[in-house]
Design a protein with these regions (language model features):
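Gly/Ala-rich beta-loop-alpha elbow adjacent to hydrolase catalytic centers
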Residues: 159, 163, 167
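Hydrolase active-site cap/lid region
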Residues: 172-210
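Short beta-strand immediately N-terminal to the catalytic nucleophile in serine-hydrolase-like folds
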Residues: 156-159, 188
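Short amphipathic alpha-helix adjacent to the substrate-entry channel of hydrolases
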Residues: 96-117
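Gly/Ser-rich "nucleophile elbow"/oxyanion-hole loop immediately N-terminal to the catalytic nucleophile
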Residues: 142-157, 177
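Alpha/beta-hydrolase active-site loop
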Residues: 125-147
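Short beta-strand element of the alpha/beta-hydrolase
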Residues: 68, 79-89
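A glycine/proline-hinged amphipathic helix-loop "lid/cap" segment
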Residues: 1-70
C-alpha cells in the first residue's frame, strides 16, 4: 500500500483520498486509476460557460483516430489564445474524460481555449505513436484555428508528468520541422529522465512497479 510509505505526520491529509497502488497488472491499474479519477471529479460542478466539443482526427499511421477535446470559454470575444494540453499517467494511464473539471477551471482562469489530446498509450502503442498523435493534433489546430475561433499566433503546449514529457518532445519536434511556431511550453512536474535510475526508483523495495 502506498500510504504505508507516507510520514505519519502527513498521513492525516491523505485520509480523504482514495487508496491507490500501481500494480504490475496494468489492466487492473488502469481500471482502478480511472475509477479513482472519476470519483475525484464527481465533487466538482461543471462550468456551463466553458463548453467543450470532441473532434476526431486521422493520425499519421495505422488509420488511427485521435480524439481531441476543445474547451472554449463563451466569455472570450474574438480569437482566443490556446493551450494544447497533454494528460499525465506515466505514458500508460489516463484519459481526457477524467480531466474535465481541471480543463474547465484552467480555461476559465487563464482566459484561453484548451485543446486536450487523447494520445495513444504504451505498451500497446510504443514511441513514437503518442508523440505523432500530439504533432498531428497541433498541426490540425494551427490549420483550423480560424474555424475554431483560436488565434494561431498564440498557441502554447503543456502537460503534467508524462504529458509534460510529451510536451517537451513535441516542442523539439515543432522546432525541428519548422512548420509553425509556439508561444511557450508549460511543463508541470515533467517526466523527462528516460533512464529512471534515481535511488528513489528502487527504494524502498515494495513490489510496486513504475
Amino acid at each position: 500500500m502506498i500510504k504505508k510509505l507516507i510520514d505519519p505526520e502527513l498521513l492525516a491529509n491523505l485520509e480523504p483520498s482514495i487508496d491507490f497502488d500501481i500494480w504490475a497488472d496494468l489492466p487492473t491499474t488502469r481500471i482502478k486509476y480511472t475509477a479513482m479519477q472519476q470519483e475525484r471529479i464527481s465533487e466538482f460542478q461543471p462550468l456551463d460557460h466553458v463548453p467543450f466539443r470532441d473532434h476526431y482526427l486521422s493520425a499519421m499511421q495505422n488509420n488511427h483516430e485521435i480524439r481531441v477535446r476543445v474547451y472554449h470559454p463563451t466569455n472570450i470575444t474574438g480569437p482566443a489564445p490556446a493551450l494544447l494540453w497533454l494528460h499525465g499517467g506515466g505514458y500508460v494511464l489516463g484519459t481526457i474524460d477524467t480531466e474535465v473539471p481541471m480543463m474547465q477551471l484552467m480555461a476559465d482562469g487563464v482566459g484561453c481555449a484548451i485543446v486536450a489530446v487523447e494520445y495513444r498509450l504504451a505498451p500497446e502503442h510504443p514511441f513514437p505513436s503518442p508523440l505523432n498523435d500530439c504533432y498531428a493534433t497541433i498541426s490540425w489546430l494551427v490549420k483550423n484555428a480560424e474555424s475554431l475561433n483560436i488565434d494561431s499566433g498564440r498557441i502554447a503546449i503543456g502537460g503534467i508528468s508524462a504529458g509534460a514529457g510529451l510536451a517537451a518532445g513535441l516542442a523539439l519536434m515543432v522546432r525541428d520541422r519548422g512548420e509553425f511556431n509556439l508561444s511557450f511550453q508549460l511543463l508541470l512536474c515533467p517526466m523527462l529522465d528516460d533512464r529512471n535510475e534515481l535511488v528513489s526508483t528502487h527504494f524502498p523495495l515494495t513490489g510496486i512497479s513504475w
